[in-house]
């Protein structure tokens, strides 16, 4: 069956603090997580829980835990089960009795997987989505050891009603085997003492484990050797019944001192002594005095401190990267908290810049003022999302007077600094006394067991000399002490050396009787001068009174005539309103000003008409000429358009004629070439014909020529016979004589 742990059952503040049988310092060794055995709390006296808009519900091994996580975790709402699966993967056998313990384990698991306050929301969601199905993947993992379950059920249920988160008055006794301290990863080097790298992620250690103000629970172990020690732990007796408790409302019993505090679990950042020394170092404004300095366990605190608070490196002031979050009293003067010059920022919120003597801006302070109507929830809302917060001494006293200290000074995931300037904090130890009291005790417990310490601290802070002393320190500390706010561990010796070097000797002894008589005589003379000046002041005051009465009489006697003149006189001067108001008053001056304004407008209109009347006729003639010129211009424009059209037509025809001439010339050239070719062909044909004719004639002549005889006279001499139709003249005519020469 799922067991549900709520803030109402784990933080019974006002209702349980007034319970006579429930002492705020009783620290139970163990308590069951079930709320069924816890007695009900009257709703009229129960503390009001914060709204659920800033809460998340985690279900781990069947137990539901409800509470407010860190501000940077709120955008991951809806991934609660993914975060739990992430813890189950790394610590499947772990158990948690409080919401803060589970939240510390979740923050550690997120940091191991690369999800911190500086991680983007998209990257963080992508990492968380990988753990969506771990519930089924790890279903086969072994269940928690019986020793753990026996320990968790070994204490009666009513003990839950005695849970009160107040720090013990007496610190825990040292044990022989303290709880092991988790070491930082090998690839997580410490930051430089004077450089704050904003890109460095938060430390991988648990950030939200409660501190000495919360009860230390026994460490659960799966080994059988731890069972006897767990069973031998002292068990607190159950409280009395609620009916008997409520009946004794006037009980005068005081809270009991706690017993031996069990060492912290291994998931805590360090043992009690180291952890408290670290808180004291930050409260004094010197993180270098912390035993865990530069070990990687408090890297996120160191980064925040050195990126916001004034400090120097190698004689040069380091520029700030974040603002100092300061909780101050309602009427507190912020300039008395530092030796630097304070300048108000021009913004809607109250913020200041701290400037050194060389003009460098060394810090920015964002101030949150307390108010009498505030509650503890309002104070926690101011501090939400900040792991290093400054509280002034007056603010601490105000919170004590108005009971606003619960959970403010006792969160392990936050460091409180009692001021804003490390140099001034060294010279103002009274706020550190209040810090020590409120860190060791709850306020109701400190009112009975540390009443004298708290009374003396409040008397010093609330006295008139406290602010005057701080103002004197601010004005008389040597200028060279500013540069001693370095991050090295030898700053104490630097302070001492500077103060010793600045020590001055008295230039004169205590004044004697003669000197006192001279001072008395000088004082008497000064008193006489003061009396004479008082007489002169009284005479001047009487003269001023007489002048006022005379002025009033003159205004009363001449005011009516002046008013009549001003009302009857028509004036257009509207620049004398201040003068008229001083003489006549606002009401009469406004009426006169309205009349003058109307007259001014009428005069302007008349003058305008008078000046423009002679020019009206000229303007009309000019307009008529202008219209005629425009009409003539239009005609000329039309004619010009026609001429341009004709010119364009002629140009087009000319272009066509040119094209036709070029074409005809081309055709003529072609025909000439063809004629030449034809002529040459005819000549060639004629030559060939003539040659053929000549050849034919030669052949014909050869055919008809008689063959000469071999011997002259032997051949017959008769001519060949002529064919029919062929006569000798025709044959002679057919023979070209020229061909016979060939």
UniProtKB/Swiss-Prot annotation:
UniProt feature, compositional bias: Low complexity: 20-46, 238-258
Residues forming coiled coils: 635-700
Superkingdom to which the source organism belongs: Viruses
Keywords: Coiled coil, RNA-binding
Disulphide bridges, residue numbers: none
Membrane-spanning residues: none
This protein's record includes keyword tRNA-binding: no
GO MF: RNA binding
Region ranges (Disordered): 14-46, 230-268
Family: Belongs to the aquareoviridae NS1 protein family.
Function per UniProt: Non-structural protein with ssRNA-binding activity. Is probably involved in the formation of viral inclusions, where the assembly of cores and the replication of viral RNA are thought to occur.
Entry protein name: Non-structural protein 1
Organism expressing this protein natively: Aquareovirus C (isolate Golden shiner/USA/GSRV/1977) (AQRV-C)
Taxonomic path: Viruses, Riboviria, Orthornavirae, Duplornaviricota, Resentoviricetes
Gene: S4
